[in-house]
């Protein structure tokens, strides 16, 4: 049967390597002897270690564990401290942001958003420290800082959702809850409240870059796997000496679409598409509720969407944005004098 490398891996077993020499102080902060693990080799490099955390890494883990502990214990308390219910309802449990009445106050009762504030603070500190660690490790190894800036694009979206936009809206209640299904429910309600995010042009761009990232990733991965029988996975060698693998890959794409990327440019395309996904998405979220109250009406005004006729009678204003409260439904009639 022909060798197919979609599922079949070849593991090269060699003596574990400690990595390039760096600053002596940093060398001392590496710990653990590298070992080879066969299961890891099925996913990537089989070597585990040595591990470098350093001061920033340890601090990041410390604050991150505190944040997760706050979320976890609050969720456990919400099911009356039952471990069984905690596991059973984990996907539905949530730590919610402060109530609207607290506005942008930094101090409120713990059960009215105080725990959320503390968890958010520690989680944000943890993420920022981890970013600083990634940046400093790249500098120490003489690398570019592309990975750190890519990570910062994701941090930007996180800060927009939980920090920047709530401040612009004047209330921490606008932030996202900590929870699996609860944050998905928040996303659905957020879109409905502001007239469907699909009409937000920055949301459109974000989805385009997201799908584009997936397409580029699939095209690049498939191309390299297709020419790995010629050594195409050794991309550094292919850059300086293209050889048979790179020539065939380039020729394939010129044949099929008239243009081909290079071994270097495909990674720049992939980096930009991936970075722009959360970057423009964050801009779209930031404009929602602060500049645009209803994206559908905005789209109609700018000839992006048609003005659909109302088919279910007169629309009722959203009480969350207009202050209008619909009248209560009439009480059910009470029938007296009839025995059950």
What does each model-identified segment do?
Residues 33-43, 76-87, 98-104, 122-148, ...:
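Cytoplasmic membrane-interface regions of multi-pass membrane proteins
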Residues 109-117, 199-217:
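Alpha-helical transmembrane segments
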Residues 74-106, 164-197, 236-253, 294-340:
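Membrane-interfacial helical/loop segments at transmembrane boundaries in membrane proteins
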Residues 72-77, 131-145, 163-176, 211-236, ...:
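Juxtamembrane/interface segments at transmembrane-helix termini
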